[in-house]
Regions:
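Hydrophobic alpha-helical signal peptides and transmembrane signal-/tail-anchor segments
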Residues: 1-5
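C-terminal capping/extension of enzyme domains
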Residues: 9-10, 14-39, 43-44, 55-57, ...
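Short, conserved, surface-exposed binding loops centered on an aromatic residue
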Residues: 40, 102-105, 144-145
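N-terminal nucleotide-binding beta1-loop-alpha1 segment
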Residues: 49-52
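Short, surface-exposed acidic-centric catalytic microdomains
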Residues: 62-130
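Short secondary-structure capping/junction motifs at helix and strand boundaries
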Residues: 86-87, 149-150, 171-172
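Internal catalytic-core helix/loop-beta-alpha segment
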Residues: 109-166
Length: 224
């Protein structure tokens, strides 16, 4: 009975864990938005995905990274790791399976945050080109919390450019290529790289199957 009580307690904690940064949400005013999510940084993370900034909250279907139901990030991850683009999709509720996503990312060592901690939206949409960076993220502070990190992954032009500026990376990598991040090694002395992937946004003109192939190549490279 004690065992099942512990299981129920664990499930309850998993279901009620909040990834919202309530302090940042409260600070957001006069057109400046502070990042509404806390960094998701599993201690075993080898990959850190850095976007630009979450879309407006009205577009969210869950309180986590890549929350827009029409963004295909979680469909890509489902296809890469489980051969099923709908593995993390709850079609009836039109949302993603948050508990499954969190457990998966913790197991695989996949971390998430964004290259901007505070932004101003020049238009009321999710397009990166209408984001003004007010406060870039302290990327070095994130890296310091990820001793096994091998790659920072960006999937958009804005995020890539912001990261290159922040980390003094002299050349912006083309899509599906990577470059070393200067003076950045993990705890094993391995070079940390910036790997640029195609955007998971449906506005990016590439078939989902091609995006899946690109993401699979990246994960395969890091798992060698």
């Amino acid at each position: 009975m004690v065992f099942f009580s512990l299981i129920r307690t664990f499930v309850y904690m998993e279901q009620t864990t909040s990834y919202l940064n309530k302090e940042h949400i409260a600070r957001s005013h006069h057109g400046v938005e502070y990042h509404p999510l806390i960094p998701f940084l599993p201690a075993n993370a080898k990959v850190l995905f850095l976007g630009s900034f979450p879309p407006p909250h009205k577009r969210w279907c869950m309180d986590f990274y890549y929350p827009n139901f029409i963004n295909d990030h979680w469909r890509i991850e489902g296809a890469v790791f489980f051969g099923d683009r709908n593995y993390f999709v709850d079609e009836d509720a039109k949302c993603f399976k948050l508990a499954d996503i969190v457990a998966f990312c913790q197991e695989k060592g996949i971390a998430f945050f964004d290259t901007s901690t505070a932004i101003r939206r020049l238009q009321d949409n999710a397009s990166d080109k209408f984001l003004e960076v007010v406060e870039p993220t302290d990327i070095c502070a994130l890296i310091a919390r990820l001793p096994q990190l091998q790659a920072i992954v960006t999937t958009g032009e804005k995020a890539t450019e912001t990261l290159c500026t922040s980390m003094n990376i002299p050349s912006i990598p083309k899509v599906n290529t990577y470059v070393p991040i200067p003076n950045t090694l993990n705890s094993h002395g391995q070079q940390v790289v910036l790997y640029r992937l195609p955007s998971s946004s449906r506005a990016y003109p590439l078939a989902l199957e091609k995006k899946v192939e690109a993401y699979r190549r990246m994960f395969d490279l890091l798992n060698r």
